[in-house]
Amino acid sequence: MAEFFDTPGGIALIILAQVLAVVAFVMISLLFLVYGDRKIWAAVQMRRGPNVVGVYGLLQSVADALKYVVKEVVIPAGADRTVFILAPMTSFVLAMIAWAVIPFNDGWVLSDINVAILYVFAVSSLEVYGVIMGGWASNSKYPFLGSLRSAAQMISYEVSIGLIIIGVILSTGSMNFGDIVRAQDTGWGFFGWYWLPHFPMVFLFFISALAETNRPPFDLPEAESELVAGYQVEYSATPFLLFMAGEYIAIFLMCALTSLLFFGGWLSPIPGLPDGVLWMVAKMAFFFFIFAMVKAITPRYRYDQLMRLGWKVFLPFSLVWVVFVAFAAKFDWFWGAFARWSVGG
């Protein structure tokens, strides 16, 4: 039996099992993310939230998913049918394949490539095409305006996210997530992670992640009061479910990136306690809680304010920070906090 797993067929079976494990984790997490998002929003508004289907309403997301699946897919008469159907599939698939390089523990990763950050950045940049396709194929002004807003917004904040990540790459000397996490394993626990030397960038990265994933207060592409529901106006049933799932998976991915880049990934915050996947999952859950709280308590930005914030505040500040980190790493300032090449690599 052991010899079988050394054959091409056995290796392919192992890879398939690993892929299915990651997909299962993301999809099960998705159900609880939607439930948690609704519960947190309800708690802030002093409501109960989902509480009927299952114990404490835990199966509400399953019921909603089944409802969307069994509904009829309605395609507008003037829509481009092929692109209309491909758009949500594109959005969902691109959100899923980004997880191929995300490690949950030391060695627990589908593809441990040296350019993992570049891969995630490339895939996340392509996600805007799903939104644009959906808005254009609907043949309606509201979806089209929403998709144009989304394109401008995602491109604007991708620049800042890229520059912030470059600062982390300069400190580590690697684009591999495993190397970045190991570079934060200094023996100081919570205070040895990158959030401390890169403290200003943590806030910029988090706010840019909100804009990148179209989350409140930056949900301009689907602003109900302005565009009805943006690029999702004409969608229903399974295509709408795929759009929504892709959006939440992208949010969860940003939570994972925040954990890996600045908060030690699977490392324990307390020296002496064992590291492991539970720390990684706990950190991702905590950052999603922050995402949900921001959605519940912040008013929506105006579109011109959103663009001004991205281009006139975040971009210059992140550019200056990259230059600062480059000098700090080169000349070993701040006791080597910005130059951990030997640790990470």
From Swiss-Prot:
Species for this entry: Ruegeria pomeroyi (strain ATCC 700808 / DSM 15171 / DSS-3)
Lineage: Bacteria, Pseudomonadati, Pseudomonadota, Alphaproteobacteria, Rhodobacterales
Entry similarity comment: Belongs to the complex I subunit 1 family.
Designated name of the protein: NADH-quinone oxidoreductase subunit H
Assembly description: NDH-1 is composed of 14 different subunits. Subunits NuoA, H, J, K, L, M, N constitute the membrane sector of the complex.
Catalysed reactions listed for this entry: a quinone + NADH + 5 H(+)(in) = a quinol + NAD(+) + 4 H(+)(out)
PANTHER family, sorted: NADH DEHYDROGENASE SUBUNIT 1, NADH-UBIQUINONE OXIDOREDUCTASE CHAIN 1
Subcellular location(s) of the protein: Cell inner membrane
Major localization listed first in the record, in broad terms: membrane
GO annotations of cellular component type: plasma membrane
Keywords on record: Cell inner membrane, Cell membrane, Membrane, NAD, Quinone, Translocase, Transmembrane, Transmembrane helix, Ubiquinone
InterPro entries, alphabetized: NADH_UbQ_OxRdtase_su1/FPO (IPR001694), NADH_UbQ_OxRdtase_su1_CS (IPR018086)
Transmembrane segments: 14-34, 84-104, 115-135, 161-181, 187-207, 248-268, 277-297, 309-329
GO terms (BP aspect): aerobic respiration
EC nos: 7.1.1.-
Membrane topology: Multi-pass membrane protein
